[in-house]
Protein backbone atom coordinates (compact mmCIF):
# COMPACT_ATOMS: atom_id res chain seq x y z
CA UNK A 1 0.00 0.00 0.00
CA UNK A 2 2.92 2.33 0.64
CA UNK A 3 3.88 2.01 -3.03
CA UNK A 4 0.34 3.06 -4.00
CA UNK A 5 0.53 6.07 -1.68
CA UNK A 6 3.88 7.06 -3.20
CA UNK A 7 2.62 6.63 -6.77
CA UNK A 8 -0.60 8.55 -6.13
CA UNK A 9 1.02 10.96 -3.68
CA UNK A 10 -1.93 10.61 -1.32
CA UNK A 11 -2.89 8.85 1.89
CA UNK A 12 -4.90 5.69 1.30
CA UNK A 13 -6.84 4.08 4.14
CA UNK A 14 -7.75 0.47 3.69
CA UNK A 15 -9.27 -2.47 5.50
CA UNK A 16 -8.97 -6.10 4.50
CA UNK A 17 -12.15 -8.11 4.87
CA UNK A 18 -11.78 -11.87 4.61
CA UNK A 19 -14.61 -13.16 2.46
CA UNK A 20 -16.31 -16.48 3.17
CA UNK A 21 -19.10 -17.45 0.78
CA UNK A 22 -20.04 -20.28 -1.57
CA UNK A 23 -17.71 -18.98 -4.26
CA UNK A 24 -14.66 -18.85 -1.97
CA UNK A 25 -15.52 -22.31 -0.63
CA UNK A 26 -15.80 -23.72 -4.17
CA UNK A 27 -12.57 -21.98 -5.18
CA UNK A 28 -10.77 -23.60 -2.23
CA UNK A 29 -12.22 -27.02 -3.04
CA UNK A 30 -10.97 -26.64 -6.62
CA UNK A 31 -7.56 -25.38 -5.47
CA UNK A 32 -7.08 -28.47 -3.32
CA UNK A 33 -8.59 -30.78 -5.97
CA UNK A 34 -11.44 -31.79 -3.66
CA UNK A 35 -14.87 -32.86 -4.84
CA UNK A 36 -17.53 -30.16 -4.84
CA UNK A 37 -20.11 -32.91 -4.29
CA UNK A 38 -18.55 -34.45 -1.18
CA UNK A 39 -20.57 -32.84 1.62
CA UNK A 40 -18.14 -33.65 4.43
CA UNK A 41 -15.18 -32.12 2.52
CA UNK A 42 -17.25 -29.04 1.69
CA UNK A 43 -18.20 -28.66 5.35
CA UNK A 44 -14.58 -29.05 6.50
CA UNK A 45 -13.38 -26.43 4.01
CA UNK A 46 -16.21 -24.09 5.01
CA UNK A 47 -15.35 -24.42 8.72
CA UNK A 48 -11.64 -23.92 8.03
CA UNK A 49 -12.22 -20.78 5.93
CA UNK A 50 -14.56 -19.39 8.58
CA UNK A 51 -11.96 -20.01 11.31
CA UNK A 52 -9.23 -18.37 9.20
CA UNK A 53 -11.51 -15.34 8.74
CA UNK A 54 -12.20 -15.21 12.49
CA UNK A 55 -8.48 -15.46 13.20
CA UNK A 56 -7.65 -12.63 10.79
CA UNK A 57 -10.33 -10.51 12.45
CA UNK A 58 -9.04 -11.45 15.94
CA UNK A 59 -5.50 -10.51 14.91
CA UNK A 60 -6.75 -7.15 13.64
CA UNK A 61 -8.12 -6.43 17.13
CA UNK A 62 -4.45 -6.06 18.15
CA UNK A 63 -4.02 -3.43 15.43
CA UNK A 64 -4.53 -3.28 11.68
CA UNK A 65 -0.89 -4.03 10.95
CA UNK A 66 -1.09 -7.23 13.02
CA UNK A 67 -4.21 -8.29 11.12
CA UNK A 68 -2.54 -7.68 7.76
CA UNK A 69 0.59 -9.49 8.92
CA UNK A 70 -1.52 -12.45 10.02
CA UNK A 71 -3.28 -12.48 6.63
CA UNK A 72 0.01 -12.36 4.70
CA UNK A 73 1.48 -15.18 6.80
CA UNK A 74 -1.65 -17.33 6.40
CA UNK A 75 -1.38 -16.89 2.63
CA UNK A 76 2.33 -17.75 2.61
CA UNK A 77 2.08 -20.81 4.83
CA UNK A 78 -1.17 -22.16 3.40
CA UNK A 79 0.10 -21.81 -0.16
CA UNK A 80 1.84 -25.10 0.58
CA UNK A 81 -1.20 -27.24 -0.08
CA UNK A 82 0.10 -30.04 2.15
CA UNK A 83 -0.21 -27.84 5.27
CA UNK A 84 -3.39 -28.08 7.34
CA UNK A 85 -4.75 -25.16 9.36
CA UNK A 86 -4.11 -26.68 12.79
CA UNK A 87 -3.71 -25.05 16.21
CA UNK A 88 0.04 -25.56 15.83
CA UNK A 89 0.07 -23.65 12.53
CA UNK A 90 -2.19 -20.94 14.01
CA UNK A 91 0.30 -20.43 16.85
CA UNK A 92 3.20 -20.22 14.38
CA UNK A 93 1.36 -17.64 12.25
CA UNK A 94 0.42 -15.64 15.36
CA UNK A 95 4.08 -15.58 16.43
CA UNK A 96 5.15 -14.39 12.97
CA UNK A 97 2.58 -11.58 13.24
CA UNK A 98 3.90 -10.66 16.71
CA UNK A 99 0.52 -11.22 18.35
CA UNK A 100 -0.06 -11.49 22.07
CA UNK A 101 -0.95 -15.19 22.15
CA UNK A 102 -3.22 -15.08 25.24
CA UNK A 103 -5.24 -12.17 23.87
CA UNK A 104 -5.43 -13.68 20.40
CA UNK A 105 -6.58 -17.05 21.77
CA UNK A 106 -9.33 -15.37 23.77
CA UNK A 107 -10.39 -13.09 20.89
CA UNK A 108 -10.52 -15.80 18.22
CA UNK A 109 -13.29 -17.54 20.17
CA UNK A 110 -15.12 -14.40 21.31
CA UNK A 111 -18.61 -13.31 20.38
CA UNK A 112 -17.27 -9.82 19.64
CA UNK A 113 -15.01 -11.15 16.86
CA UNK A 114 -17.89 -13.21 15.43
CA UNK A 115 -20.15 -10.14 15.37
CA UNK A 116 -17.44 -8.02 13.78
CA UNK A 117 -16.83 -10.62 11.07
CA UNK A 118 -20.58 -10.95 10.45
CA UNK A 119 -20.76 -7.16 10.03
CA UNK A 120 -17.87 -7.26 7.53
CA UNK A 121 -19.55 -10.07 5.56
CA UNK A 122 -22.78 -8.04 5.45
CA UNK A 123 -20.91 -4.98 4.18
CA UNK A 124 -19.23 -7.04 1.47
CA UNK A 125 -22.58 -8.57 0.49
CA UNK A 126 -24.34 -5.18 0.46
CA UNK A 127 -21.63 -3.78 -1.81
CA UNK A 128 -21.86 -6.71 -4.20
CA UNK A 129 -18.52 -8.33 -3.41
CA UNK A 130 -18.75 -12.01 -4.33
CA UNK A 131 -15.21 -12.82 -5.42
CA UNK A 132 -11.68 -12.22 -4.26
CA UNK A 133 -9.65 -10.17 -4.62
CA UNK A 134 -12.07 -7.25 -4.86
CA UNK A 135 -11.55 -3.72 -3.60
CA UNK A 136 -14.08 -1.03 -2.86
CA UNK A 137 -12.79 2.51 -2.96
CA UNK A 138 -14.94 4.81 -0.86
CA UNK A 139 -15.02 8.57 -1.24
CA UNK A 140 -14.86 10.01 2.28
CA UNK A 141 -16.32 13.31 1.02
CA UNK A 142 -19.30 11.63 -0.65
CA UNK A 143 -20.37 8.45 1.17
CA UNK A 144 -22.82 7.61 -1.63
CA UNK A 145 -19.94 7.11 -4.06
CA UNK A 146 -17.82 4.00 -4.25
CA UNK A 147 -15.84 2.26 -6.95
CA UNK A 148 -15.79 -1.55 -7.12
CA UNK A 149 -12.58 -3.04 -8.54
CA UNK A 150 -12.78 -6.75 -9.36
CA UNK A 151 -9.59 -8.84 -9.57
CA UNK A 152 -7.98 -6.10 -7.52
CA UNK A 153 -4.32 -5.27 -7.76
CA UNK A 154 -2.58 -2.15 -6.52
CA UNK A 155 -1.81 -1.32 -10.14
CA UNK A 156 -5.53 -1.31 -10.97
CA UNK A 157 -6.10 1.24 -8.19
CA UNK A 158 -3.36 3.44 -9.60
CA UNK A 159 -4.79 3.02 -13.12
CA UNK A 160 -8.27 4.06 -11.93
CA UNK A 161 -6.81 7.26 -10.51
CA UNK A 162 -4.78 7.93 -13.65
CA UNK A 163 -7.72 7.30 -15.99
CA UNK A 164 -10.05 9.72 -14.27
CA UNK A 165 -12.24 7.35 -12.29
CA UNK A 166 -10.71 8.76 -9.13
CA UNK A 167 -9.28 12.16 -8.37
CA UNK A 168 -6.91 13.31 -5.66
CA UNK A 169 -8.15 16.54 -4.06
CA UNK A 170 -6.11 19.31 -2.41
CA UNK A 171 -6.29 17.44 0.92
CA UNK A 172 -4.57 14.52 -0.84
CA UNK A 173 -7.58 12.22 -0.54
CA UNK A 174 -9.08 10.00 -3.22
CA UNK A 175 -12.48 11.27 -4.36
CA UNK A 176 -14.71 10.56 -7.34
CA UNK A 177 -14.67 12.92 -10.30
Say what each PLM segment does.
Residues 2-82:
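Structural alpha/beta surface segment adjacent to cysteine/selenocysteine redox centers
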Residues 1-9, 85-177:
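C-terminal cap of thioredoxin/glutaredoxin-like
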